[in-house]
Amino acid sequence: MGYGAGRDKYEPAATSEQGGKKKKGKGKGKEKDMDELKKEVTMEDHKLSLDELHRKFGTDMQRGLTTARAAEILARDGPNALTPPPTTPEWVKFCRQLFGGFSMLLWIGAILCFLAYGIQAAMEEEPQNDNLYLGVVLSAVVIITGCFSYYQEAKSSKIMESFKNMVPQQALVIRSGEKLSINAEEVVLGDLVEVKGGDRIPADLRVISSHGCKVDNSSLTGESEPQTRSPDFTNENPLETRNIAFFSTNCVEGTARGIVVNTGDRTVMGRIATLASGLDGGRTPIAIEIEHFIHIITGVAVFLGVSFFILSLILQYTWLEAVIFLIGIIVANVPEGLLATVTVCLTLTAKRMARKNCLVKNLEAVETLGSTSTICSDKTGTLTQNRMTVAHMWFDNQIHEADTTENQSGASFDKSSPTWTALSRVAGLCNRAVFQAGQENTPILKRDVAGDASESALLKCIELCCGSVRDMREKNHKVAEIPFNSTNKYQLSVHKNANPSESRYILVMKGAPERILDRCTSIILQGKEQPLDEELKDAFQNAYLELGGLGERVLGFCHLALPDDQFPDGFQFDTEEVNFPTENLCFVGLISMIDPPRAAVPDAVGKCRSAGIKVIMVTGDHPITAKAIAKGVGIISEGNETVEDIAARLNIPVNQVNPRDAKACVIHGTDLKDMTEEQIDDILRHHTEIVFARTSPQQKLIIVEGCQRQGAIVAVTGDGVNDSPALKKADIGIAMGIAGSDVSKQAADMILLDDNFASIVTGVEEGRLIFDNLKKSIAYTLTSNIPEITPFLIFIIANIPLPLGTVTILCIDLGTDMVPAISLAYEQAESDIMKRQPRNPKTDKLVNERLISMAYGQIGMIQALGGFFTYFVILAENGFLPWTLLGIRVNWDDRWTNDVEDSYGQQWTYEQRKIVEFTCHTSFFISIVVVQWADLIICKTRRNSVFQQGMKNKILIFGLFEETALAAFLSYCPGMDVALRMYPLKPTWWFCAFPYSLIIFIYDEVRKLIIRRSPGGWVEKESYY
C-alpha cells in the first residue's frame, strides 16, 4: 500500500496499552459515544462555497488568519494532536500478573497456611513448621511466576515501542500573508495550509486550489491507488469527495492549498483512533477458560474441605483440629505448579511463533488464535503482494499473459512482435516513475521506485522484458509533457526519436482505454499500421471487458510519429496552448495490472477451510477487483457462484434469483450501510463465502460485531488506521508489521512481521496445539492430586498414621511434576489438528467433566492405590500390619507415649515411630513419581496410541529422567532427613508401585483403542477430554 516506512509518524502511539485489553466504563454515556462513532462520517464543509467558508472560519483566502487570531483559536481548541490512549502504569501491570485469576487461588492457599500455623503455634508447645514452609513456598511461587509473565509482556512492549518513529511533524501555513513553517500541533481551525508531494496532511483540509495533487488514502479508506484532490465538490460522501484532504494521509505528488476544517481528535482519523481506544476488547478465551478451571478446582477443594470438616467433628476431633484439617485439604487440592506450567507453555508458543514471524503482544492471545472460527482479512498487502504488477497485455488482437509470480517462474509471452516493441517503448517513455538510486545489484522486482503504483509496475515490467528503461529514456530525450489529470484522463509526452529511419519526434500517450481509443483512427497489427474499423473496436471492447472483469486496472497506449516538415528540429512544443496533434493517433495496445495474490495464500485459505475456519475478505477496493482476488486465492472456491453469476448464467434479472441459491456473495459498502442487524446476520449465516468491498472503517466494525453475534471467535487482519477499531473489537486483532500503521499495531494483539496471511494459519495451528497441550499438562498435573489428598482423608477417617506429609506434597507439585508438565508443551500435534472444527468456547472447555473424571476418578485412583500399597508394605515390614493401624493415630502422634506396641509386641518410642512415618512419606512420594511416569506417557495423546505418536519429544524423555533423579536425590541425599524429613528407602521399595504404573498404561491404551474403533461411542462421550 503506502510508501514504506514514511507513513504514520504521529499517531497516538507514543504511549500504548500493551497486555490486557482495556475495560470500558459501564456508563451509558460511553455507549452513546460508541454509537455516535459507529455512524458514518458526517461533514458539511465539502459542500460550502468559498464565501461560505470565509464566513464560517473568518479566513482570508489569500492571507490566511492573523497570527493573533490563530493564537486565540489555539488557546480555545488546544493543540492539533490526537489524545494518547490511557496507559496502564507499570506497577498496575505487575500487580495484574501477581493477583490475576490463578495467582489469587495460590495467595488464598498461602494465607490459609499461615493461619493454620498460627492456630498450631497457639495450641502446641512445639508446633510443626510444615504449614509455615508451605505458606512461604506458595507466596514465592506466585511472585516468581508473576515476575516471569511480567517480563515476557514487557519484552513484547519493547518491540512495540521500537515500531514507533515519533518525529515532530512540520506544516506550512500562511498567516497574515506570510508563509511560516510551524509544528503541526500548532495548526488551528481555519488556518490556510499549503502541502506538496511527500508531505503529511497536518489536519482535515478543505482544498481551495490544487495543481496535480494526489493523496495516498490507503491508511484511511484502504484504496491502494492515490486519489486526486481538487477544489471541486464531487460527492455527497465526505470520504469520496475530491475537495477534502484528511489528516495523517500523505500527499504523493503535486501541490494544494486548503483551509483547516477539523483538528486533533475531531478529524476523521482522530475519530477512528478514539473509536479504537474506546472499544472494549473483552476477555480472551483462555482467560475465561482458566477462570472456569479455577472455579472447578476451588469448588472441589471447598466441598471436600467442608465435608471432612463436618466428618472430623462427628468423629469427635476438637474444633481446632477440624479447622487444621479443613485448611490442609483445601491446600492439598491446589495444584501449585500449574500456574508456572501455563505461563511457560504460553511463553514457549509465543517464542515459537516469533520465529515464524508472528509477534504476540499478550501471551493469552496465543491460544485465542487457535479457537478462531472466522478470519476477516484485509485484501491489500495481506492476501496480495502489495505491489501492482503487470498481469496481461493486449496487442496484435490477442491477450498475452505476463508473469506475476514473486520469483518470475510463471508464464512468458512472445516478445518478438514489432507491436510489442512499440508498446514497450510507449510504456517506458510515457512514464514518470524512476528507480531510486544505488539499487543496481537489487533484483528488479525488489527495487524501490519513486512514482505511483501503476507506473512503477510498468517500469519494472519493461525493465525486465526490454532492458534498461533509463537508457531508453536517454536515447529518446523528452521535450514536452502533459501530466495526467482527471478531466482529460491521459498522460502525454513528446520525445526526440532515437530511430533514424523514423520521424524526428514521436508523441506517446497513455490513459483510460476508452479515452485513448477515442483519440485514435488507426491501430498497429504485426508492426503494420491499419485503419481502426468497427470489428477491431469490438475486439478492443471485448479485451477491455475481459481484463476489467479479472479485477485488473487497464491502461491504453498509443503513439504518433510527428511529421518532420511540420515539426523541424528545435520546434518549441507548447503544452499550455497545445500546438501539436492529440487526435488521429495510432493505437498500440492495452496493458493491465493487478496487485497479485501472495504465493502461499491459496494454500493457507485451503487449510483454513479444512480446519473449519471461515475466511471473509473485507476491503476498501472495488467489488470486481475484490471478487477476482477472492477467486484467485480460494476465498470464493471454484464452482461457487454469487447471485450476479447465477443471473448471468440463467440470463435473468438479479432480483429474480433466490439469494439462498448462491453460496458466495460480494457485498458493496453502500448496500451494507442500509442493512439492519438482522439482514447482516442473515448474510453471515447463509453464505459460506463472503467478500465485502468498498467498506468504511465503521462498517468493518459492524461486520466483526455481526460475526460475534453468530457466536464466532473472530480474528481480524489489517494494516491501516481504518482497521484499528475492528482490530480492537475482534477476539484477536492481527496487524501488519511492515505496512501497518502505528494505530493499528497498537490496537492489535498480534503482529505479522512478514505481513503474510499464511503466517496466520501457522498461528492457528500453534494456537490449537497449545490448547491441546495445555489440556494434557493439566490432566497430568491434576492426576497426582488424588494420591496427595486421599492419604489425608484416610488419616482423618481411619485414624491411621499420616501416609504423606505436606512438605512431600510440595516436592511433587513444585519439584518432580514441573519439568514433565512443561515438557508436554513441546508435544507434536496429533494428526487431526487442522482437520477438525474450531472448538466451541461454550461447550469445549479447557477443563471439562471428562478430564476431571479421568484425572480424579480413574487414573488418580489407581495412583492412590499404588501409594497406599507401598505405605502398607513398609509399615508391615516394620511390624505394623494394616489392621493394627486403625485408630492408632492418637497414641502414635502423642510425644509423651513411648510404648506403642506393634503386631509382634515390640514397643516403639515416639522418635522411632516418627522415623518410620517419615520413611512412609518418602516411599509414598516415590510411588507417586513411579505412577506419574505412566501418566506422563499416556497424556502425550488424547486419541492416538502412544505407539503411533512415538517418543520423539526429547524434552519429555528428559522430564522422565529428571523427575526420577530428583526423587532419588531427595531420598538419598545426606541431610534431607533434617531439612525435608525424607529418609533413604530400600531399593525394593521402589518397585512396589511398578504394577500400578503398568495398569495405568494398559488401561489407557485400551480406552484409546475403543475410541478409535467406535468414534462417537459411549467411551468417547464419557472419557475423551
UniProtKB/Swiss-Prot annotation:
Reaction(s) the record says it catalyses: K(+)(out) + Na(+)(in) + ATP + H2O = K(+)(in) + Na(+)(out) + ADP + phosphate + H(+)
Annotated active site: D378 (4-aspartylphosphate intermediate)
Extracellular topological intervals: 111-133, 311-322, 795-804, 869-920, 973-987
Sequence segments annotated as region (Disordered): 1-37, 216-237
Residues in the Cytoplasmic compartment per record: 1-89, 155-290, 341-774, 826-845, 941-953, 1009-1025
Topology in membrane: Multi-pass membrane protein
Any one GO molecular function term: metal ion binding
GO CC term, one of those recorded: membrane
Ligand binding (ATP): K489
Enzyme Commission number(s): 7.2.2.13
Phosphoserine: residues carrying this PTM: S16, S945
Pfam families the record matches: Cation_ATPase, Cation_ATPase_C, Cation_ATPase_N, E1-E2_ATPase
Record's compositionally biased regions (Basic and acidic residues): 1-11, 28-37
Keyword GTP-binding part of the UniProt annotation: no
Keywords: ATP-binding, Cell membrane, Ion transport, Magnesium, Membrane, Metal-binding, Nucleotide-binding, Phosphoprotein, Potassium, Potassium transport, Sodium, Sodium transport, Sodium/potassium transport, Translocase, Transmembrane, Transmembrane helix, Transport
Localization terms from the record: Cell membrane, Sarcolemma
TM region(s), chain numbering: 90-110, 134-154, 291-310, 323-340, 775-794, 805-825, 846-868, 921-940, 954-972, 988-1008
Residues that hold Mg(2+) according to the record: D719, D723
GO biological process: intracellular potassium ion homeostasis; intracellular sodium ion homeostasis; membrane repolarization; potassium ion import across plasma membrane; proton transmembrane transport; sodium ion export across plasma membrane
InterPro entries for the chain: ATPase_P-typ_cation-transptr_C (IPR006068), ATPase_P-typ_cation-transptr_N (IPR004014), ATPase_P-typ_cyto_dom_N (IPR023299), ATPase_P-typ_P_site (IPR018303), ATPase_P-typ_TM_dom_sf (IPR023298), ATPase_P-typ_transduc_dom_A_sf (IPR008250), Cation_transp_ATPase_P-type (IPR050510), HAD-like_sf (IPR036412)
Keyword Repeat applies: no
Class of enzymatic activity (EC top level): translocase
Subunit comment: The sodium/potassium-transporting ATPase is composed of a catalytic alpha subunit, an auxiliary non-catalytic beta subunit and an additional regulatory subunit.
Family indicated by similarity: Belongs to the cation transport ATPase (P-type) (TC 3.A.3) family. Type IIC subfamily.
Role summary: This is the catalytic component of the active enzyme, which catalyzes the hydrolysis of ATP coupled with the exchange of sodium and potassium ions across the plasma membrane. This action creates the electrochemical gradient of sodium and potassium ions, providing the energy for active transport of various nutrients.
Protein name, entry field: Sodium/potassium-transporting ATPase subunit alpha-1
Gene: atp1a1
